Amino acid sequence: RLLAVELARQGHRVDIYDAGSPAAEHSAATVAAAMLAPLAESAITEPGVVRMGHHALTRWPQLLAALAEPVFFQQAGTLIVWHRQDAAEAQRLTRQLEANQHHVPELPALQKLDGAALAQAEPTLAQRFAQGLYLPGEGQLDNRQLLAALVVEMQRLSVRTHWHSPQSPETFTPGAPGQPDWVLDCRGLGAKSQWSALRGVRGEVVRIHAPDVTLQRPTRLVHPRYPIYIAPKEDHLFVIGATEIESDDLSPASVRSTLELLSAAYAVHPGFAEGRILELATQCRPTLPDNLPAIRQTRQGVLEINGLYRHGFMIAPAMLDVTLEVLNTGQSQLSQRFDLALDLAPASVPATSAAALA
């Protein structure tokens, strides 16, 4: 949807074919917490993805400002806390993040918080935690508001939308009369028949309304077995997740993982005890063998964009900008900066029309 909007804004004729509905209720994008945390995520990914996340922190405000509908966006940093018994794990993580920050020096340096500094940042957490880390500059957005705002924007820009219309690139003959110049395949796991290396990585997320919880920024709990994140949205809505399971199973969340998730959230803030569970959702993230995103051109006029793994919203603007470079110039300088796997056919023609598959 982001790509369709930006292409239409540039004056291209765009059709979008989506297997789902405007609400995108069965997509990983709807379930996600939409945290924009490149340094925090550097613990489990490569420097190129971290640079993509840093790039996105400057691009998201620009992209959101151009939308007619408001979208919650916050850039108040990330807080990381731990219990005393997990201090060794926290020290290991701290050293890792400091080393990663040296590899991507444009990122702001993390700040170590003692009890007094933690109390100033998040007063309610100081009652349970003696130390913490603050990662300045990181942020989050409301993914569901964004998905809805992009639907409105597509209507405003006369993007032709085809809901409940699953398609594959084979349906089209790019460049032929009456056909688009480009087909952009952004289907995630829906493209597995074309991109056999794709796999699903399952995640489980709970949404809780908790008026007694006053967290002001995304907060992560260090735990050797069960680390969690808590992303506070507007109106005391909290998105809480942790699990990452090597499986494309879309069945409901298990009792065990749900109990662990809720127990860990309560351990961070007692106000969750009286919260109300609004939703317990599972979804699978499209992931390539190296857990890194990639863009490839399989034939003239067909570009496949996939493998965003757990970093979809964090790197989406970077993937967008690389794709726009390819469509407009036939190559991308940004992809080199991001160490992004980009496999293009020898000759790419600039686009005037496009069909996006979602």
Predicted regions and their residues:
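Active-site substrate-recognition segment that forms the wall
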Residues: L2-Q10, M35-L36, P70-Q74, R187-Q300
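Short loop/edge segments at beta-strand edges and connector loops
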Residues: D18, D114-G115, T161-P166, E279-A281
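Dinucleotide-binding Rossmann-like beta1-alpha1 core, especially the glycine-rich loop
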Residues: A33-A117, A121
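Short beta-strand to alpha-helix junction loop
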Residues: I44-H54, R84-E89, L133-A149, P252-S257, ...
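Helical element adjacent to the flavin cofactor pocket in flavoenzyme catalytic cores
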Residues: A126-W182, C186
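C-terminal catalytic lobe of FAD-dependent flavoproteins
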Residues: G275-A358
